[in-house]
């Protein structure tokens, strides 16, 4: 018996491995895998259902059909195992060997492997340096190829047609060798000397100068080197032996009625074997060449179809006209092996059911239907029954459970106690989509869910279903309880704010409870405490809203963390006093002494978590929920049609708007405004009217007049149910109320343009047919949009997860001093995001100094928690340099300090945390809330774009940065720099507002001056760009010849004349090379120099410039010499929402990107071509100038002779991220992508922490291009992993050698995922064939570093609790001892888990 057990154990041994290598299989290797040759195309005998001998299902080759029984039945039972039956030749063993034993087919003629032929770029083509078309013509027997030219004038690899071949044969006889078909290609590949070829190419590479040639050579060298290094032989790309898949992986199943269901592969194999056998026969018969050739071609096509059907020519179809599924189709796509079976599996011990509300549950509980629990916990119940001796055998236990005896239910209760289960709701968009709960047995068939976790699951109770999973092992239960329990997931990993926040009814209940009311019953009472408040409320002596005085005891923590009590009399209401009873000790009373809306409640829970920690917060959240439900029920808030009060003013507002519209219409008919202007104006009028109506309506709703104690009238906040729901944040918004009681307003057509007739009615009045019809547009578009959005958002999430999946925190501190400078986000006059929100939970990269002093406020490497942030705010620090993932120096991972706080736990992040996946989920999860539309700017928006002044909102002082200016004749500052910024600083030194100031703006206030709110500080003409002189003197025209370079125009209305410079296209030949300019000279006619330089003041004028001054006029600095009319931007579309986020992460180049200066220097314009200008930048140090051709229609921001810095904008437009990286560096591109992505999310009110976007940016910057190789093994122009270059350079520098220089590359997320080092991860993402082909040729090793690869091969992932296990394995391997037990034991797991958890939970108190 012992032997038997030993034998069974040996059957299930697991392989320990550290890497997976993929390479080409040599014919010998294929034969060594094989257990025999498949000679016949037969499958099974249709009468006996026994496999045919030597056929595709042959038992002799692949193993027995029944366990331990040979085919003819001579040997049965286990005692004969290992015997080979002499009659039928079948080995007696388990039948599962039919899943792993392979066969082979000896091909009568070699055939090319289609992957290496047709997967672009063609590997065979690249290796032989022949065009794919030619190779295909040889392979499919259309032409000959010369293999050995001998002494003739024929080149090797020359292609000959049939006629040319015959001619050559006549001329040279057998001096030369030419063949056709795969044999020819095989011979060519065989005769290649790879190393010799490599040498030749390298020499050629050094000599050539042409860029395209270099690229091609580098590609070939790389491929050749890959072959040399991996030990693959090129001729192995041509198959001479074809492996046959084990039969149980391509099953043949008899259906009833004598038919068979079969895998398509069997058809494809049969076809190959048939053609191969026929070819053998033809060769034996020495058949005519043309017949043999045809058969060989058909064999090649059959093998192509088997490997990858449809890659070449038409796909081979089966009986039902659908293409057969080939081997390649089995692994790729959503239904392929990778995504269907390796990354996603069906799980045992799981069930699903509809969910319903469990308002009486605790936060860590869920209601599990008894029937379901009985089914899920069956094995545990059987075990317990047997242990207790209630059942003698498992079979008896089974019977008891099936009969559902009384004792079974008692046992079930025991089994379930403290055994957490996992609840999951699809779609699982972030990690909170699976959480653990303790089950509570309930009657009925629906799972009960705690209302507060609905937000995390995005669940509602309109028929949603959820799945239950049972963690079986001790370790799994431990992890579920310690890491996944709903009580441990109070904060959202995306932004660190509480995600367990009351909503809807609970909010309404708490809001109703904490409202106050004038002259309510019991007003003015003085009560001894919350208990008495509750008593008098229950007794009906006071209303919930009565304003009373109550004695309140507050607790505060002192230095030692002990609670100190303060008691005082507070003005409050009865309801607030009652609510105070559930607030935990340690929170101030002020937190509930207000009307609590959703925001306030969220803040309350957040404060509670930060001050008191996890446990009190959980209890408090539960209590708020119970209280909220109870008082929402008592409030009796309901909606009736009379609650929707329509404002009286509505009628007159609408008639006013109609009158205005009529007036515009008249103007249009008399030709004063264009159709576009009329449309925009009409829309503006209606939009304004709509706002007025809704304002009137809200004013009407939000207050009501009541009689107070003294009998006077008083205004108070309304108790209108609809208003209360919106005001508390429970449900609905002002916009929705507007549609109920105001007017519905403007509607959009399906294409996004606005219909100019608004719906003036609201839902209370009811819509007429036309209005109803217009509204249906919007409603339907909404539904269609939602469906599209979900798919797009899901795809974005998948790409993000794929690019970031292998990023894990691997060390504590990388020691870098690099970081990102964080400043508050200010748009126009508003602080969109204060500094504290941006730096909270980050680690400082440098000491933060107290502004204006050298005192250190916060030392370097400090994790900024709430108290530090308060300190920063108190000292009004407005910029902090923090560590960032992007600048982290860790190889293949990130250090904890560069990441900072784990947002979901509130302490510094643990090692082994999978930050990449968390980042991807945090960005992808809100994707469905983003819009899909592109915004058409028109109407109000287009006019706002043509701003002409800056008006500040707050009082403070002005601070200008990046400024060059001159003072004009009236003493005002005129800006002459391009990217000037104006900031408004308040008295505490904090930046309140920030504006861009254009060139030529006239400042009303200077730098450092005080301004009051509402003051205008700068003016400019939005329609023209001025040319401003920096010096005073007299104007001298140069090259301004009337009729050749300029023309004089007179304005009809004013009679003033001006000169207009002609565009070079409009000039006569004589004027083509002239450069019109205005020179400034002094009274003697000498050139005036620009201050600070030795350059004469000379201003070149571009085409279309208007000069209103005459030659010789005196001017003073700051005057406008000429004006260049600006084309008004027209209506540009802004891509918004999801498509914009996808564009940013895919690093797509915008259509007409901004043109940036490649080097610093002086701008001048060279010779123009037909449609382009030549921009020349000459460096100041006299090195080579840089030239670039720019299309004429691009508006330039620079004048001739102006100095630019590297990365300055020369022509406006959306900036391309690649340019920013190249010219301004990694931090600039990070800042750009983070800010742009945040803008999109901020617009939708979604909060995501910056560091998640930075994590993705780090992954986009994974690759670097080698510029010069130094002493390294890299090739110039090769793209390599950034970490690899860093490691190589470190080693070289340690040995005193020259490292490689490189430039960082920015890859879009799809590209970056495919360029990952792990071929398994890339193959399971997209383009499986290409990835695998490339990997096989290079003989790649996959080190299984990322999470995805480990999931695919079925190991623990190297993150979370698996991180410790992997670290331990690496340590053991380094010590050179193999572990005695490959499996991880329960003790190890629980120990390492405990260590991890202590790190996690211990860190929360002291930050």
From Swiss-Prot:
PANTHER family attached to this UniProt entry: DNA-DIRECTED RNA POLYMERASE (PTHR19376), DNA-DIRECTED RNA POLYMERASE SUBUNIT BETA (PTHR19376:SF54)
* Positions annotated to bind Mg(2+): 460, 462, 464
Task: Outline what the protein does.
Answer: DNA-dependent RNA polymerase catalyzes the transcription of DNA into RNA using the four ribonucleoside triphosphates as substrates. Chromosomal supercoiling density is controlled by a combination of RNA polymerase and DNA gyrase activity; negative supercoiling increases upstream of transcribed regions while it decreases downstream, DNA gyrase introduces negative supercoils into underwound DNA.
Tell me yes or no: is Magnesium among this UniProt entry's keywords: yes
Q: What are its cofactors? A: Mg(2+); Zn(2+)
Where, in this chain's numbering, is Zn(2+) 1 bound? 70, 72, 85, 88
A Pfam family this chain is assigned to: RNA_pol_Rpb1_1
Q: Which gene encodes it?
A: rpoC
Query: What's the protein name?
Result: DNA-directed RNA polymerase subunit beta'
Q: Which family is annotated?
A: Belongs to the RNA polymerase beta' chain family.
Gene Ontology biological process: DNA-templated transcription
Q: How is the cofactor bound?
A: Binds 1 Mg(2+) ion per subunit.
Superkingdom of origin: Bacteria
Kindly state which reaction or reactions the protein catalyses: RNA(n) + a ribonucleoside 5'-triphosphate = RNA(n+1) + diphosphate
